[in-house]
Amino acid sequence: MEDFVRQCFNPMIVELAEKAMKEYGEDPKIETNKFAAICTHLEVCFMYSDFHFIDERGESIIVESGDPNALLKHRFEIIEGRDRTMAWTVVNSICNTTGVEKPKFLPDLYDYKENRFIEIGVTRREVHIYYLEKANKIKSEKTHIHIFSFTGEEMATKADYTLDEESRARIKTRLFTIRQEMASRGLWDSFVSPREAKRQLKKDLKLQEPCAGSPTKVSHRTSPALKTLEPMWMDSNRTAALRASFLKCPKK
């Protein structure tokens, strides 16, 4: 699964996911399913924000190519992917500036057009079940919830899907592609089932045990993540590197 993640996600997303896991004391090399889930969630958040701007009249517009007009601002503020301290700083700044209610939990995005925080969910289960779990945890009518599944289903607060149909279709297509690529590598079942994941982990660890009298092979594979990557939110064109195309999973 770790190799799949590093091959199939943009290196910037991989690095952000690694940092997020290490912040909570988690190891991407061990908790590989969580690693894949975090990368998927990050990518959906970036795709949700990508191409969407607000013009000088306050109208939401989509700009897919060319140099964006200087008067345009990003419609969405990306909160997911930042370290907790910086994320709360951004949330507090937004609340102080707009007067919106401060959320109890860190949201994923802020929509400057609708003036609301957004919680993005990506689930391997039934969308309505995951939606209810999110709503029960957040316990706030102010935070908008939008859930996507790997089967193309989605569910949002009051059936308000925020984005246009084409933008949502891009996200659904990407999720379906990830599912298909996982399945072709025999990874999907363990990704969906925690029990199967534990069984696979035990199997992998057993296979990694050095045999008596056999030389131990040590892998020195270098992470493709950019070592000098600047945080994407510090760049005015923070999603430009992700726009052209998300890396397509190479076939074995």
Swiss-Prot record:
Main location: host cell
One Pfam family, short name: Flu_PA
MF (Gene Ontology): RNA binding
Top-level taxon in the UniProt lineage: Viruses
Annotated site (Important for efficient shutoff activity): 202-203, 206
Active-site residues, as the UniProt record annotates them: 80, 108
Site entry: Important for efficient shutoff activity and nuclear localization: 195, 198-199
BP GO terms, sorted: viral RNA genome replication; viral translational frameshifting
UniProt keyword annotation of DNA repair present: no
Subcellular location: Host cytoplasm; Host nucleus
Alphabetically ordered keywords of this record: Decay of host mRNAs by virus, Eukaryotic host gene expression shutoff by virus, Host cytoplasm, Host gene expression shutoff by virus, Host mRNA suppression by virus, Host nucleus, Host-virus interaction
Entry note about domains: The probable endonuclease active site in the N-terminus and the basic amino acid cluster in the C-terminus are important for the shutoff activity. The C-terminus acts as a nuclear localization signal. The C-terminus is recruited to host protein complexes involved in nuclear Pol II RNA processing.
Function text: Plays a major role in the shutoff of the host protein expression by cleaving mRNAs probably via an endonuclease activity. This host shutoff allows the virus to escape from the host antiviral response. Hijacks host RNA splicing machinery to selectively target host RNAs containing introns for destruction. This may explain the preferential degradation of RNAs that have undergone co- or post-transcriptional processing.
Family membership noted in the UniProt record: Belongs to the influenza viruses PA-X family.
Protein known as: Protein PA-X
Organism of this sequence: Influenza A virus (strain A/Gull/Maryland/704/1977 H13N6)
Biological classification of the source: Viruses, Riboviria, Orthornavirae, Negarnaviricota, Polyploviricotina
UniProt gene name: PA
